[in-house]
Amino acid sequence: MNSRKDKNSKGKNSDTKRKKSSQENDKAVVLLSGGLDSTTCLYQALADGKKIQALSFDYGQKHKIELSYAKKITRQLGISHTIQKLKPELFLGSSLTQKSLRVPKNSLGKEEIPNTYVPGRNILFLSFAVCLAEGTGSNSIYIGVNAMDYSGYPDCRPEFIKTYETAIQLGTKKGNQGSPIKIVTPLQNLSKKEIVLLGNRLQVPFHLTFSCYDPKNRKACGKCDACLLRKKGFQETGVSEK
């Protein structure tokens, strides 16, 4: 009799664990800036059937206007959205955060890492995302990094993402218990043209995204790398931004 009860108890525990694991697999943290890439990434996570916690950062960036677009998108979708405020003093040496440094214009395609690179930004952003993912029982983090039509940032490369994912597995409770947090990079190997086409298929409201490093009076400058790449993507596809 006891043996039968033990078997039933083990069966129930196993079912409970499977149900919990399934629920965790349905949850994801999405890093959302409000730009074209991160918003397309958000819609890909939705298409993957994920229950999403969006995470954005206010770190004193010149293009903070993107956050207002992130708010619009998450409100429209009814998605939980956290904006984490960080001190600008943490991000020195970048033209995206320092008024004394000018954002490069019409310089797309140059080999060197541009001064729009923000030291340690993706490392820090992913660390916050890991905290949120583990705390909410999420098994994946979506980030819209891109290594094709990109500005040369080292923290957007596949090697960085792979290495960071290994660090997460080694340094978290979930990773040590055999339920590692995965970093999902759906745009990693896509050109800007392909990202626009993907966004179009996913029905991303492009008019609710903003891509500019140096906006003036809430309008895109049209000359920075972010503006030029966005323009290139839409021109090559013929897809409308509106």
From Swiss-Prot:
Quote the EC number: 6.3.4.20
Binding residues annotated for ATP, in chain numbering: L32, S33, G34, G35, L36, D37, S38, T39, T40, C41, L42
List residues binding Zn(2+). C212, C221, C224, C227
What does the record give as cofactor? Zn(2+)
Q: Which GO terms describe its biological process?
A: queuosine biosynthetic process
Q: Which pathway does it take part in? A: Purine metabolism; 7-cyano-7-deazaguanine biosynthesis
Stretches for region Disordered? 1-25
Task: Give the record's cofactor note, including how many are bound.
Answer: Binds 1 zinc ion per subunit.
Q: Enumerate the catalysed reactions.
A: 7-carboxy-7-deazaguanine + NH4(+) + ATP = 7-cyano-7-deazaguanine + ADP + phosphate + H2O + H(+)
Which keywords are on file for this protein? ATP-binding, Ligase, Metal-binding, Nucleotide-binding, Queuosine biosynthesis, Zinc
According to its UniProt entry, what is the function of this protein? Catalyzes the ATP-dependent conversion of 7-carboxy-7-deazaguanine (CDG) to 7-cyano-7-deazaguanine (preQ(0)).
Q: Which family does it belong to?
A: Belongs to the QueC family.
Question: PANTHER family recorded for this chain?
Answer: 7-CYANO-7-DEAZAGUANINE SYNTHASE
Question: Which protein is depicted?
Answer: 7-cyano-7-deazaguanine synthase
Tell me the lineage of the source organism.
Bacteria, Pseudomonadati, Spirochaetota, Spirochaetia, Leptospirales
